[in-house]
């Protein structure tokens, strides 16, 4: 009975691990991988039979495939729209090198900054690339298997309202490695949403969960005099994001520049 089970297991392994071009038989009579030169067979001490084993490069390839799978899953949770996954440092056109470099360095130093609960505040006019850099940070960190979520506040509020136990939402929020709050200040200024925004920022602040915020609100407004929750929201953001970064360029909207550069045929057809 045992021999049959063993034989079946060996035959099944042989189907999965086969000799490939470049593989060779070593001096010990075992099959070796032609790429990494590690054994693809092993002799059982039990009965002296050769059994297939996974070579080193196949193990590394399998690990990398598993990592990429996990990164894809994390990215699908992180973003609402597939297009957001295309915002990467590799696709950055380099319109604002200083901001790009700061965002890259944030990712490179994330382990250290995360322990301190420090995030990044990107502020500036419409269309200058604030969201792009926030998404690029999220993409870079999910690729390193960090749990990240990107939200706009109204979207976050709907998710909060539609859930069963609301406390579970905040438990999930502070379990993240990074939260990205996109377009702060663009949401409807209602009492309920302002109160919710404070609760979100306060939960992240108290748990030292780092967050990246993008906003069209000026630094003067952020540091100005406000009453109640709005004042406490901005104070907590500025404490956790101590070096606000202005995202702007003399040429104006990056979004408009990108569209022009990426559609030369359209421009040619219109004669512009």
Predicted feature locations:
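Interdomain "pre-motor" coupling segment immediately N-terminal to P-loop NTPase/helicase cores
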Residues: 32-80
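Conserved adenine-nucleotide phosphate-binding loops and their immediately adjacent elements
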Residues: 77-90
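Pre-Walker A (pre-P-loop) alpha-helix and adjacent loop at the N terminus of AAA/AAA+ ATPase modules
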Residues: 90-120
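Short glycine-rich substrate-engagement loop in P-loop NTPases that contacts/grips substrate
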Residues: 97-104, 123, 138-178, 187-195
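Walker B catalytic acidic pair
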Residues: 182-184
């Amino acid at each position: 009975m045992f021999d049959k089970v063993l034989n079946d297991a060996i035959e099944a392994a042989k189907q999965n691990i086969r000799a490939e071009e470049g593989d060779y038989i070593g001096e010990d009579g075992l099959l070796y991988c032609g790429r990494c030169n590690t054994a693809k067979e092993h002799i059982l001490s039990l009965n002296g039979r050769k059994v297939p084993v996974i070579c080193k490069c196949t193990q590394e390839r399998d690990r990398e495939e598993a990592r990429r799978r996990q990164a894809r899953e994390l990215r699908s949770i992180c973003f609402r729209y597939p297009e957001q996954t295309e915002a990467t440092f590799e696709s950055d056109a380099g319109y604002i090198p200083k901001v790009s470099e700061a965002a890259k360095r944030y990712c490179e130093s994330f382990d250290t900054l995360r322990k301190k609960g420090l995030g990044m505040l990107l502020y500036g006019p419409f269309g200058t690339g604030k969201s792009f850099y926030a998404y690029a940070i999220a993409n870079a960190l999910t690729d390193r298997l960090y749990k990240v979520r990107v939200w706009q506040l109204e979207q976050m509020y709907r998710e909060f309202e539609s859930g069963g136990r609301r406390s579970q939402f905040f438990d999930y929020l502070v379990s993240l490695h990074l939260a990205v709050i996109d377009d702060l200040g663009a949401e409807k200024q209602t009492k309920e949403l302002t109160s919710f925004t404070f609760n979100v920022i306060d939960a992240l602040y108290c748990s030292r969960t780092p967050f990246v915020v993008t906003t069209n609100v000026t630094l003067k407004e952020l540091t100005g005099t406000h009453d109640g929750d709005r004042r406490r929201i901005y104070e907590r953001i500025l404490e956790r994001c101590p070096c606000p970064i202005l995202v702007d360029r003399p040429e104006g909207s990056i979004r408009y520049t990108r569209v022009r550069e990426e559609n030369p045929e359209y421009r040619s057809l219109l004669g512009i």
